[in-house]
């Protein structure tokens, strides 16, 4: 079984590819994605479950991002930063089994790895605001 960090990185990579290929359906993108990211079936199922849930809430998540990005539009965000924010907001709002502080920290670390140091700070600021407005506690999870 792969780590949750690796799941998150694969999701960000997938979301980036999906962002670059607008109009392509989730299932078609997944078929192409697995050609370059071979995993065992159980790990694929875990990643796909997260991705299907993200796709279900993607429009609401993007609206949430728009509401927090001041004097900026979603289209002007660096695509990788947008993908990291989508994942982080999904976890904070929809994954009650993951403490939000963990989601924020993981998102910041992924931003530092795949984007810039400044992106890490930007992602942290946006996700912290989302957390505060969500009413969840930073270390609260509900199994």
Swiss-Prot record:
<dbReference type="InterPro" id="IPR006027">
    <property type="entry name" value="NusB_RsmB_TIM44"/>
</dbReference>
<protein>
    <recommendedName>
        <fullName>Transcription antitermination protein NusB</fullName>
    </recommendedName>
</protein>
<dbReference type="Pfam" id="PF01029">
    <property type="entry name" value="NusB"/>
</dbReference>
<keyword id="KW-0804">Transcription</keyword>
<comment type="similarity">
    <text>Belongs to the NusB family.</text>
</comment>
<keyword id="KW-0694">RNA-binding</keyword>
<comment type="function">
    <text>Involved in transcription antitermination. Required for transcription of ribosomal RNA (rRNA) genes. Binds specifically to the boxA antiterminator sequence of the ribosomal RNA (rrn) operons.</text>
</comment>
<dbReference type="GO" id="GO:0005829">
    <property type="term" value="C:cytosol"/>
</dbReference>
<dbReference type="InterPro" id="IPR035926">
    <property type="entry name" value="NusB-like_sf"/>
</dbReference>
<keyword id="KW-0889">Transcription antitermination</keyword>
<keyword id="KW-0805">Transcription regulation</keyword>
<dbReference type="InterPro" id="IPR011605">
    <property type="entry name" value="NusB_fam"/>
</dbReference>
<dbReference type="GO" id="GO:0006353">
    <property type="term" value="P:DNA-templated transcription termination"/>
</dbReference>
<dbReference type="GO" id="GO:0031564">
    <property type="term" value="P:transcription antitermination"/>
</dbReference>
<dbReference type="GO" id="GO:0003723">
    <property type="term" value="F:RNA binding"/>
</dbReference>
